[in-house]
């Protein structure tokens, strides 16, 4: 069983699965979410696409890496789920940046705004992650560099185009 944790396009995952199958090998696309902290703590979310029997065999190992390991469907489904996750990450990251820019321009301390948002309906994981980075302007030490998100949003943009979907917020976030 080959397990791939890359975030790539769905076609790449399916091509890898087909090539592996020709060699008699199972391939699971199993992208992860949760960052370095999730990896260190064994709390990653792992979204898996592929054969159910192969998933059941690999689960013993995947379960040591992640607290939330789910078979999403056939080959490509794990990758698709990761892209869906990244769609929300991208949009929420842009929304948080704009919210904190507005707070700053209104004379509101970023940390105070973040403290209130964490107990309000406007809360999001990305807002909570972005607040200290924005407050200190320490963008170099972000756990997930913008270039990774930019790559993922580009894949999402291409997928939406290929599927004939109009994902306006995704397109605006990518810009």
Q: Which role does the model predict for each range below?
A:
Residues 4-86:
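Rossmann-fold dinucleotide-binding core
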């Amino acid at each position: 069983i080959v397990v791939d944790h890359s975030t790539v396009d769905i076609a790449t995952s399916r091509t890898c699965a087909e090539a592996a199958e020709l060699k008699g090998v199972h391939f699971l696309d199993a992208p992860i979410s949760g960052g370095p902290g999730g990896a260190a703590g064994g709390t990653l979310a792992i979204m898996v696409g592929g054969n159910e029997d192969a998933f059941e065999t690999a689960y013993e190992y995947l379960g040591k890496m992640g607290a939330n390991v789910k078979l999403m469907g056939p080959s490509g489904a794990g990758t698709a789920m990761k892209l869906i996750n990244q769609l929300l990450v991208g949009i929420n990251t842009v929304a948080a940046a704009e919210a904190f820019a507005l707070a700053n321009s209104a004379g509101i301390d970023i940390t105070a705004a973040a403290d209130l948002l964490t107990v309000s309906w406007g809360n999001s994981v990305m807002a909570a992650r972005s607040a200290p980075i924005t407050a200190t302007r320490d963008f170099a030490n972000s756990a997930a560099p913008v270039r990774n998100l930019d790559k993922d949003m580009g894949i999402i943009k291409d997928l939406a185009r290929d599927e004939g979907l109009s994902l306006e917020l995704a397109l605006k976030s990518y810009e």
